[in-house]
Amino acid sequence: MSSEAETQQPPQPAADAESPSSPAAAATAGDKKVIATKVLGTVKWFNVRNGYGFINRNDTKEDVFVHQTAIKKNNPRKYLRSVGDGETVEFDVVEGEKGAEAANVTGPGGVPVQGSKYAADRNRYRRYPRRRAPPRDYQENYQSDPEAEPREKREGAESAPEGEMQQQQRRPTYPGRRRYPPYFVRRRYGRRPPYTNSQRGEMTEGGEGEENQGGPDQGNKPMRQNYYRGFRPSRGPSRPRPVRDGEEDKENQSESGQNQEPRQRRYRRNFNYRRRRPQTTKPQDGKDSKAADASADKSAAPEAEQGGAD
């Protein structure tokens, strides 16, 4: 009995069984059984948005399901993994849950697939890291008046050693590229810069130049501009106020005095004073009432005389 047991040998494994070191076993994805390898087929259709499609095998004319995760070598210019409709691909056939599936999908001979024409391309200029641009220096690139350069910058440039000056001169310059300061870019469309003091002085009478020239302190202040869209400052010639009898002499005296003084001291009249009632109306009302009483007495006297005569 013991000799017969020793002579009996264990059954040999099947020839088609796969060893763990075989390439077919290595090609299995998630312990899936490999049906065929290096099979050529034509893509029937592939949905880039959903990420799946079907491949028609050239040998058996069978449709094989393919998922975007099964694509091994994708087109490097494409952003997503995909295969194009009608493209010839090479793949392995494995057994899936619902039927045959494709795995290790590549182009013929192991080249990358072409990909679908509906798949998004990668950005062309992002392949290599960007070069860091030099720091923006608005005073160098946009300087209309050389005398307006700040003193601190000129003093710093004089005190800087020669080595730093050479490094600043070696900075690359980009021809044809003009950089503007940030405040200029914001007011670029549909807005004009505020008037300077020289422009305000040259304007004629009745305009903004004469109105904005107030006292000696107001001439040096910069013009304040409203940056809200659709704002229109209402600046027009001031309307003349009705002149009374008592104020004619005063205005004549004030005009003669103003002609002697320079025009720069004239200031814009505050419009809030128009709403206030003038205080000089009371004595005038008294004079008018007295004149009315006197005229009434005069008219009553002739009537009385006529009645006596009758």
From Swiss-Prot:
<dbReference type="GO" id="GO:0017148">
    <property type="term" value="P:negative regulation of translation"/>
</dbReference>
<dbReference type="InterPro" id="IPR011129">
    <property type="entry name" value="CSD"/>
</dbReference>
<dbReference type="GO" id="GO:0003676">
    <property type="term" value="F:nucleic acid binding"/>
</dbReference>
<dbReference type="GO" id="GO:0007343">
    <property type="term" value="P:egg activation"/>
</dbReference>
<dbReference type="GO" id="GO:0048025">
    <property type="term" value="P:negative regulation of mRNA splicing, via spliceosome"/>
</dbReference>
<dbReference type="GO" id="GO:0045947">
    <property type="term" value="P:negative regulation of translational initiation"/>
</dbReference>
<dbReference type="GO" id="GO:0062153">
    <property type="term" value="F:C5-methylcytidine-containing RNA reader activity"/>
</dbReference>
<feature type="compositionally biased region" description="Basic residues">
    <location>
        <begin position="265"/>
        <end position="279"/>
    </location>
</feature>
<dbReference type="GO" id="GO:0000932">
    <property type="term" value="C:P-body"/>
</dbReference>
<dbReference type="GO" id="GO:0005634">
    <property type="term" value="C:nucleus"/>
</dbReference>
<feature type="domain" description="CSD">
    <location>
        <begin position="38"/>
        <end position="107"/>
    </location>
</feature>
<dbReference type="GO" id="GO:0008190">
    <property type="term" value="F:eukaryotic initiation factor 4E binding"/>
</dbReference>
<keyword id="KW-0964">Secreted</keyword>
<dbReference type="GO" id="GO:0010468">
    <property type="term" value="P:regulation of gene expression"/>
</dbReference>
<keyword id="KW-0805">Transcription regulation</keyword>
<dbReference type="InterPro" id="IPR012340">
    <property type="entry name" value="NA-bd_OB-fold"/>
</dbReference>
<dbReference type="GO" id="GO:0051031">
    <property type="term" value="P:tRNA transport"/>
</dbReference>
<feature type="compositionally biased region" description="Basic residues">
    <location>
        <begin position="176"/>
        <end position="191"/>
    </location>
</feature>
<dbReference type="GO" id="GO:0051236">
    <property type="term" value="P:establishment of RNA localization"/>
</dbReference>
<dbReference type="GO" id="GO:0008327">
    <property type="term" value="F:methyl-CpG binding"/>
</dbReference>
<dbReference type="GO" id="GO:0003723">
    <property type="term" value="F:RNA binding"/>
</dbReference>
<dbReference type="GO" id="GO:0043009">
    <property type="term" value="P:chordate embryonic development"/>
</dbReference>
<dbReference type="GO" id="GO:0035198">
    <property type="term" value="F:miRNA binding"/>
</dbReference>
<feature type="compositionally biased region" description="Low complexity">
    <location>
        <begin position="1"/>
        <end position="29"/>
    </location>
</feature>
<dbReference type="GO" id="GO:0008380">
    <property type="term" value="P:RNA splicing"/>
</dbReference>
<keyword id="KW-0539">Nucleus</keyword>
<dbReference type="InterPro" id="IPR002059">
    <property type="entry name" value="CSP_DNA-bd"/>
</dbReference>
<dbReference type="GO" id="GO:0001556">
    <property type="term" value="P:oocyte maturation"/>
</dbReference>
<feature type="region of interest" description="Disordered">
    <location>
        <begin position="102"/>
        <end position="310"/>
    </location>
</feature>
<feature type="compositionally biased region" description="Basic and acidic residues">
    <location>
        <begin position="148"/>
        <end position="157"/>
    </location>
</feature>
<dbReference type="GO" id="GO:1990428">
    <property type="term" value="P:miRNA transport"/>
</dbReference>
<feature type="region of interest" description="C5-methylcytosine binding">
    <location>
        <begin position="45"/>
        <end position="50"/>
    </location>
</feature>
<dbReference type="GO" id="GO:0048598">
    <property type="term" value="P:embryonic morphogenesis"/>
</dbReference>
<protein>
    <recommendedName>
        <fullName>Y-box-binding protein 1</fullName>
    </recommendedName>
</protein>
<feature type="region of interest" description="Disordered">
    <location>
        <begin position="1"/>
        <end position="31"/>
    </location>
</feature>
<keyword id="KW-0963">Cytoplasm</keyword>
<dbReference type="GO" id="GO:2000773">
    <property type="term" value="P:negative regulation of cellular senescence"/>
</dbReference>
<feature type="compositionally biased region" description="Basic and acidic residues">
    <location>
        <begin position="242"/>
        <end position="253"/>
    </location>
</feature>
<keyword id="KW-0238">DNA-binding</keyword>
<dbReference type="GO" id="GO:0050658">
    <property type="term" value="P:RNA transport"/>
</dbReference>
<dbReference type="GO" id="GO:0050686">
    <property type="term" value="P:negative regulation of mRNA processing"/>
</dbReference>
<keyword id="KW-0804">Transcription</keyword>
